């Protein structure tokens, strides 16, 4: 949640987008609650990656730590001081990248039923959309496994758009993949993307 949500101005000039209340509850708080509801074990830690302290100050940090404590988890704060993409943001939380983990974009607002199979090596949650060319989409094989991940395809690949929630049985594998992306300086649009790390795991 290190970005500033410029597409939602003027609301986000004073409130970071993930903290904007929807039906009285901040987006990120509802997201954490939803994830806690589908995880089949206690959540030990919620790591928040936030931006510049000038925009994400002490009051916001306190609010985020309370969101974690409300579900019985330890809250950890990491900083991404410059917008360098989702892949880079995840690596800012490097000390927390081990064991099973859910990665979620803090401004994800999807009201849907979803479940988590802890036996799966990894899961990417998707949603059918009418304009797949505007999203990152996945292609599935006959068994429902992901075979391809394409960002804003120019030609039709599928209508299953990635919603920004991922599960990894061992997030250390994503960490290693993203580290190689950073080492190789694999940049798209001036940023390091999580998708480039995930593609190395498919």
Where is each model-derived feature located?
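The conserved acidic donor/metal-binding loop of glycosyltransferases
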Residues: 106-109
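Short, hydrophobic/glycine-enriched beta-strand segments
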Residues: 1-3
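Short acidic-glycine loop/turn motifs at beta-strand connectors
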Residues: 139-145
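Conserved N-terminal catalytic core of the sugar/cofactor nucleotidyltransferase
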Residues: 7, 13, 20-21, 25-103, ...
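Conserved donor-nucleotide/metal-binding helix-loop-beta segment in metal-dependent transferases, i.e.
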Residues: 111-134
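Short, well-ordered beta-strand micro-motif
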Residues: 21, 139, 167-169
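Catalytic-core segments of class I nucleotidyltransferases/pyrophosphorylases
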Residues: 145-202
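Short N-terminal binding/cap micro-motifs at the start of the first secondary-structure element
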Residues: 5-10, 133
């Amino acid at each position: 949640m290190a970005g500033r949500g410029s597409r939602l101005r003027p609301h986000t000039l004073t409130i970071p987008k993930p903290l904007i209340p929807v039906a009285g509850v901040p987006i990120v708080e509802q997201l954490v609650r939803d994830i806690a509801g589908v995880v089949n074990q206690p959540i030990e830690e919620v790591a928040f990656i936030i931006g510049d302290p000038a925009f994400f100050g002490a009051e916001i940090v306190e609010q985020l730590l309370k969101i974690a404590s409300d579900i019985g988890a330890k809250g950890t704060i990491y900083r991404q001081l410059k917008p360098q993409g989702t892949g880079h943001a995840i690596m800012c939380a490097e000390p927390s990248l081990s064991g099973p983990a859910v990665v979620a974009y803090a401004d994800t607002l999807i009201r849907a039923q979803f479940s988590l199979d802890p036996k799966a090596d990894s899961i990417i949650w998707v949603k059918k959309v009418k304009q797949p060319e505007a999203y990152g989409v996945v292609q599935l094989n006959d068994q429902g496994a992901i075979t391809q991940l394409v960002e804003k395809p120019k030609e039709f690949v599928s209508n299953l758009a990635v919603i920004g929630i991922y599960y990894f049985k061992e997030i250390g594998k994503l960490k290693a993949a993203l580290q190689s992306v950073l080492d190789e300086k694999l940049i798209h649009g001036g940023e390091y993307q999580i998708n480039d790390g995930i593609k190395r795991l498919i």
